[in-house]
C-alpha cells in the first residue's frame, strides 16, 4: 500500500515538473502545431546566428535583403513588365470606345427619327413605348465601356498578361512579411541580448541592450524610421498610380476627382496612410529586432521602387 502511494506521488511530481518545463522552458512543438512555422523561422534565425557569429543587427537586415532579392524581386520585375505590356495594349483598345459610342449614337438617332415620324402621322405616344431600342447617353457610354473591356480582356489573354496575375506579388510578399515578422516575434519572446558585437559598436555604449524590448536609449528612433519609410513608399506608389492612370496611355485629360477609378485609388492611398500610422504605433512598442526587420524591409521596397521606376518607367 505504501509502495503504491509512493509511486503515485512520484508520478504526480514528474507530471508537475514536465508541465513546468513546458511552461517556462522550450516550447513543445506538439502543443502549438498551428504556429510551428513561426517557431521554425525563429529556430533558423538562432541557428544561423550561432553558427556565423553575425550580430543580430546585421543578420536581420542581411536576411531581409536576401529574402526580398531572391523571392519578391523577381515577382516585382515580372509584374512591372507585365503592367507595361498591359498599358501598351490599352493604347490599342482605347480608340475603340469613341467609335462604339458614335455607332450606337447613330443607330439611336435613326430609330428616334423614325419614331418621331410615326408619332407625327398618327397619335402621340411616349418615346419609350414607341421604340424600346432607343438608348440614352448613359446607356451608350455603358455599352461602349463594356465592349471595350471585353476586347481588352481578349487581348490581354492573347498576349498572356491577364489582370489576375497582378495579384501574384501581394500573394507572395504579404505572407512572407507576416511569417518573418511572427518568427522574429517568437524569437524575442525571451530575453535576447547580443554577445557578438564588434569592438566599434561596443564603443558606442550599445553593447548590452536587450533586443527583445523597445530601444530604451532612443525610443523614438525606430518609430520615426518605420513611419518615414512607410510614408515614402505609400506616396511614391500613389504618385505612380495617379500618373499612370491616363497619361501612361498617351491621353492628356483634365483631372476628374469624381471618377470611380480616382475614388478607388484615393481610398487605397488613405487606407495605406492609415496603415503607416498603425505601424508607427506598433513599432514604438515592438521589440527592437522586429522594428529593425520592418525598417530594412521598407528601405528595400523604397530603393526597389525607385530603381524599377527608372528602368521600367510607367510613363513613356
From Swiss-Prot:
Residues 185-213, 296-316 are mitochondrial matrix. The chain crosses the membrane at residues 164-184, 214-234, 275-295. GO terms for cellular component: mitochondrial inner membrane. Keywords: Membrane, Mitochondrion, Mitochondrion inner membrane, Transit peptide, Transmembrane, Transmembrane helix. One of its GO terms (biological process) is mitochondrial cytochrome c oxidase assembly. It is found in: Mitochondrion inner membrane. It is a multi-pass membrane protein. Present with 468 molecules/cell in log phase SD medium. Required for the insertion of integral membrane proteins into the mitochondrial inner membrane. Essential for the activity and assembly of cytochrome c oxidase. Plays a central role in the translocation and export of the C-terminal part of the COX2 protein into the mitochondrial intermembrane space. This is Cytochrome c oxidase assembly protein COX18, mitochondrial.
Amino acid at each position: 500500500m505504501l509502495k503504491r502511494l509512493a509511486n503515485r506521488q512520484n508520478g504526480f511530481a514528474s507530471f508537475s515538473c514536465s508541465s513546468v518545463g513546458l511552461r517556462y522552458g522550450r516550447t513543445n512543438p506538439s502543443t502549438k502545431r498551428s504556429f510551428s512555422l513561426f517557431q521554425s523561422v525563429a529556430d533558423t534565425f538562432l541557428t544561423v546566428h550561432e553558427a556565423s557569429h553575425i550580430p543580430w543587427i546585421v543578420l536581420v537586415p542581411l536576411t531581409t535583403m536576401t529574402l526580398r532579392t531572391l523571392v519578391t524581386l523577381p515577382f516585382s520585375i515580372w509584374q512591372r513588365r507585365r503592367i507595361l505590356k498591359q498599358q501598351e495594349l490599352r493604347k490599342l483598345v482605347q480608340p475603340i470606345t469613341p467609335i462604339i459610342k458614335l455607332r450606337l449614337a447613330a443607330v439611336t438617332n435613326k430609330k428616334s427619327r423614325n419614331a418621331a415620324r410615326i408619332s407625327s402621322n398618327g397619335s402621340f405616344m411616349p418615346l419609350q413605348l414607341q421604340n424600346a431600342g432607343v438608348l440614352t447617353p448613359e446607356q451608350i457610354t455603358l455599352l461602349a465601356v463594356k465592349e471595350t473591356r471585353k476586347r481588352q480582356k481578349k487581348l490581354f489573354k492573347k498576349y498572356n498578361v491577364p489582370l489576375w496575375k497582378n495579384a501574384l506579388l501581394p500573394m507572395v510578399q504579404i505572407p512572407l512579411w507576416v511569417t518573418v515578422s511572427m518568427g522574429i516575434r517568437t524569437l524575442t519572446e525571451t530575453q535576447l541580448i547580443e554577445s557578438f558585437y564588434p569592438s566599434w559598436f561596443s564603443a558606442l555604449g550599445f553593447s548590452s541592450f536587450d533586443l527583445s524590448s523597445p530601444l530604451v536609449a532612443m525610443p523614438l528612433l525606430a518609430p520615426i524610421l518605420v513611419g518615414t519609410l512607410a510614408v515614402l513608399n505609400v506616396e511614391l506608389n500613389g504618385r505612380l498610380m495617379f500618373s499612370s492612370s491616363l497619361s501612361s496611355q498617351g491621353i492628356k485629360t483634365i483631372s476628374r476627382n469624381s471618377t470611380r477609378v480616382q475614388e478607388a485609388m484615393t481610398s487605397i492611398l488613405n487606407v495605406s496612410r492609415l496603415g503607416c500610422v498603425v505601424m508607427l504605433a506598433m513599432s514604438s512598442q515592438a521589440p527592437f529586432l522586429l522594428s529593425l526587420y520592418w525598417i530594412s524591409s521598407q528601405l528595400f521596397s523604397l530603393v526597389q521602387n525607385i530603381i524599377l521606376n527608372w528602368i521600367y518607367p510607367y510613363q513613356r
